[in-house]
Amino acid sequence: MMKIDLNADLGEGCGNDALLMPLISSANIACGFHAGDAQTMRESVRLALAHGVAMGAHPGFADRENFGRTAMQLPPETIYAETLYQIGALAAIARAEGGRLAHVKPHGMLYNQAAKDAALADAIAQAVKDFDASLILVGLAGSELIRAGARYRLATREEVFADRGYLADGALVPRSEPGALIEDDDEAVSRTLMMVQEGRVRSRDGAWAAVNAQTVCLHGDGAHALAFARRLREAFDARQIQVSA
């Protein structure tokens, strides 16, 4: 049976967390910089533990006003320290609740910049390794962040997005450009199944882009995120694709 991890970014104040949690296998929990706070982190940890969902830190830029989605030019030393800080905060809460972290996935523009910037990606990978070398580093399939994880001898998990458009080189279409979001549910499900089963996706310009789909991201902040999550789970179940971290 084919297996796929299904993850969502939670603890960001979007209100769907309790309903999304039973549908996913991994939760990326906001660590207080781009969203969330100590209380939401604790609530998210408890929800994940209650549903047997793998927990991961979701560090981002300290940019609440823009939800961590605006580019920031910070030195690698700052990226390292802020990543370490956020992982440590969530790990402490998880430990106090009787759990432990399984992975780290950067958020928003930190994620996007690390996909292309080797120095930034190295800073994140170094922080993960120095905190706990057993943690899985999650990044965009084929990106610099995945290569950084390999350089630092971390386990990595290559990610694809159910509702995002792709460029021919496997990068995501920037949110500011046409085709960034796949808004038709049928198309999004079909594209996701193709990425998981065939390892390819049709890019914005019509070319095929190769992707290694080890985990699929569901965005929890969309208006119909819950309904789409259920549809995608049904599609996986119908094809005997096991959802598991």
UniProtKB/Swiss-Prot annotation:
UniProt-listed Pfam families: LamB_YcsF (PF03746)
InterPro entries linked: Glyco_hydro/deAcase_b/a-brl, LamB/YcsF/PxpA-like
Reactions this protein catalyses: 5-oxo-L-proline + ATP + 2 H2O = L-glutamate + ADP + phosphate + H(+)
EC number: 3.5.2.9
Keywords (A to Z) from UniProt: ATP-binding, Hydrolase, Nucleotide-binding
Gene Ontology terms for molecular function: 5-oxoprolinase (ATP-hydrolyzing) activity; ATP binding
Keyword Hydrolase: yes
GO biological process: carbohydrate metabolic process
Subunit structure: Forms a complex composed of PxpA, PxpB and PxpC.
Task performed by this protein: Catalyzes the cleavage of 5-oxoproline to form L-glutamate coupled to the hydrolysis of ATP to ADP and inorganic phosphate.
Similarity comment: Belongs to the LamB/PxpA family.
Family matches, as NCBIfam families: PRK05406.1-1 (NF003812), PRK05406.1-3 (NF003814), PRK05406.1-4 (NF003815), PRK05406.1-5 (NF003816)
The name this protein goes by in its record: 5-oxoprolinase subunit A
